[in-house]
Amino acid sequence: MQASDIQPRTVPRHLAIIMDGNNRWARREGLPGVAGHRAGAEVVREIVSACESRGIRYLTLFAFSSENWGRPRAEVRALLALLSRYLRNEVAKLASDGVRLRVIGRRDRFSPRLQRLIAKAEAETEAGERATLTLALDYGGRWDVAQVTKSIARDVLAGALRLDEVDEEAIAQRLATADLPDPDLCIRTAGETRISNFLLWQFAYAEFWFTEVLWPDFDETVLDLALADYAVRERRFGVRPLLHQY
């Protein structure tokens, strides 16, 4: 199935991607690990454009997890340097294409310079209405739930929220993704079949598609395979379809 064969109504409104396999790609090619991350960053540019052209309104990329701080220091520095370069080089194109960039996750552990760069990129693309690209940086699903819990506790103690008002909606409104619809589809590359602490609450009814393809090898063809598979799935959201009554 080609991109032109996928009907707009079957395209996921919100696509999340767990980008995995950069280091394995570099080892396969006999290159240092940072080369894999550079190659992966190039793929991000292509996939952002591909999603926009296919009518996917929201794209969320797991770019730097809370657990990534535990990687070798040199690798962390390389990852953050690539992130800084992406923010500097891609913002103008995102803005001209009408793509809003937003970042979710902790920012306080990043350098003040990177924090300013993130804020600047968000401000310069704020008017984008065609699509929203969300980068999950220093993000963890458990952190997200914990910060919601703290927010609710503060509001209850302050009298701004009654205990009987704490429901799913109250939680959803305080998540890092509060202004986004829940993901419809999550793609994970490199043969891994776990969600690795990503969007734990938000994935409640998401569809998942796993591929052996390493992220630097991911392209529009693989994306279309995922979209074609998603297009024929029946999403039930936990509800069994009613049988026809005669």
Describe these PLM feature segments.
Residues 1-246:
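Flexible, compositionally biased loop and terminal segments
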